[in-house]
Amino acid sequence: MTRFARYACALLLLLVATPSIAHAADPSGDGLGGHLRTTDDRLRRLLDLGTRTSPTLRALVRRLIDSDVVVYLWCERADTAPADGRLTFVSAAGGHRYVVVRLVRFHSRERQIALMAHELRHAVEIADAPDVVDAESLEREYRRIGYMSSTPTADRKTFDTRAAVDAGVQVMNELMLADDD
């Protein structure tokens, strides 16, 4: 079993075995949550703030709530992270597709929320592509809709999309305008 496969299995076991500690962000308050989860109180607060302040982030969250994609949000230290933000496909099981979004912790709330929006846009791209059911189909989809964002290595390829970049910029603009009020 490859290192990635062992990691994915362990992560899936952790995600399935600990649903009671996962928090579902539901900006509408209508009980449709469960698709955005985190055990990080700061990320939970920032997600709540972002969905109250940014129409763009709110729309991304609503789209995910209406999808079969479940997103786990994690923060990681900048000195151990290969990128500021990244999304990893974990598994498709039980009618859901599970992804993990890892975010570097920033001091700026606005920057953190904008990065979260960028990565959640990627989760929406997966929600919009029902054929994405594993890492290989995810790579195929990103080769189709996006572009390579860095030089690939033997164990890692990174992609981005114009839509995700635009979502992050738009959310940052909305947050900055809200601060001016």
Could you tell me what each predicted segment is?
Residues 1-9:
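Bacterial N-terminal signal peptides that target proteins for export
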Residues 8-19:
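Bacterial N-terminal signal peptides
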Residues 30-44, 95-104, 143-152:
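Acidic/histidine-rich, surface-exposed loop or edge segments in extracytoplasmic proteins
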Residues 33-70:
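N-terminal targeting signals for Sec/Tat export/insertion, comprising classic cleavable signal peptides
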Residues 59-63, 67-70, 74-89, 93, ...:
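Metalloprotease/metallohydrolase-associated module, dominated by Zn2+-dependent proteases
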Residues 100-116:
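Short pre-active-site segment immediately N-terminal to the catalytic Zn-binding motif
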Residues 120-136:
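Catalytic Zn2+-binding segment of zinc metalloproteases
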